[in-house]
Design a protein with these regions (language model features):
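Short carbohydrate-recognition loop motifs
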Residues: 99-120, 124
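Extracellular recognition modules
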Residues: 37-41, 263-265
Length: 292
């Protein structure tokens, strides 16, 4: 009896923050949901072949945005969410169920920046709980997720309207703002955390701000992989478009076992925690799914 092991090959590179990351090489390894053909050859001649289907990948909970009862769409309903939340509290229009040409199904999510107490409140949608008290909002990032396969990308539909910064003072570290142009952002992160990571934003300076493209570990535990999309211009036309955001791995081998293992975040302004961005930015998102 002969056996064979199929393992992915990885391409190593350095990201913009100078950190080493890895991406799987297409055509190597076995990935969820894909079909494969295996052949046995002797002296260059195929003597046996077989096809097999890898087990299906995982579903992102309510990634189709079809349920109007999701906590992210309500006002002050994200404090105990089990997956999708938003900053809807002092203002209720940061995340709403909506419709848009090109969406999948009957509904999508609409994120829209608002003015709250004279400051920018970026439209947002995230896998986090959210609590608003004493004029401050606390987003606690991280949801339990039982990983069974490594994704190569996050696929979704989106449409963004992005303008120039017109609210707030640009922070010192502002590489995501170029020539005064705001940027929206979508990211997905595989983490191995023992607790949620809290980011607090209010009338003063934010605390707990983090960027998965700049760190492979937080106080809560390792950041295993991330995918990030910065959107610096308005999407052409009126219809949503499909995008695949590649996942880059800091750690190629560890399977997350922590209490909190997934973060997805969408915001109309990359520096929304600092109350900096364009009042007028709008982003529609729908049909979140993994690519393997």
């Amino acid at each position: 009896i002969y056996t064979a092991t199929f393992t992915a090959q990885w391409k190593e590179s350095v990201n913009a923050a100078g950190l080493t990351v890895h991406t799987p090489v297409a055509g190597t390894g076995v990935f969820a949901g894909n079909s494969y053909e295996a052949r046995a050859a002797l002296d260059g001649e195929t003597v046996s072949s077989a096809e097999f289907q890898a087990a299906a990948g995982q579903v992102i909970p309510d990634g189709d945005m079809e349920s109007g009862s999701l906590p992210c769409f309500g006002k002050s309903t994200s404090e105990s969410t089990t997956f999708w939340g938003s900053g809807n509290a002092a203002t209720s229009g940061l995340c709403a169920q909506s419709t848009k040409p090109g969406m999948g199904g009957s509904y999508c999510a609409k994120l829209e920046s608002q003015s709250a107490f004279g400051l920018l409140a970026a439209g947002n949608l995230f896998s986090a709980t959210f609590r608003f008290a004493s004029l401050s909002g606390t987003a606690s990032f991280g949801m339990p997720y039982q990983w069974t396969a490594r994704p190569t990308a996050l696929r979704l539909k989106y449409h963004a309207t992005v303008g120039a910064v017109n609210k707030g003072t640009v922070p010192e570290e502002h590489e995501y703002i170029q020539d005064g142009q705001d940027r929206s952002r979508i990211f997905a992160v595989i983490v191995d955390w023992n607790s949620r990571h809290a980011t607090v934003a209010g009338m003063g300076s934010p605390t707990g701000v983090w960027d998965p493209a700049k760190t492979a570990e937080t106080a809560e535990g390792p950041v295993i992989a991330y995918g990030s999309l910065l959107i610096g211009e308005t999407t052409p036309g009126d219809a949503m478009t499909t995008v695949e955001i590649p996942i880059e791995y800091y750690d190629r081998t560890t399977k997350p076992t922590g209490a909190y293992t997934l973060v997805i975040s969408c915001t109309t302004s990359a520096y929304g925690d600092f109350k900096v961005g364009c009042l007028g930015n709008v982003m529609y998102v729908d049909d979140f799914e993994w690519v393997y």
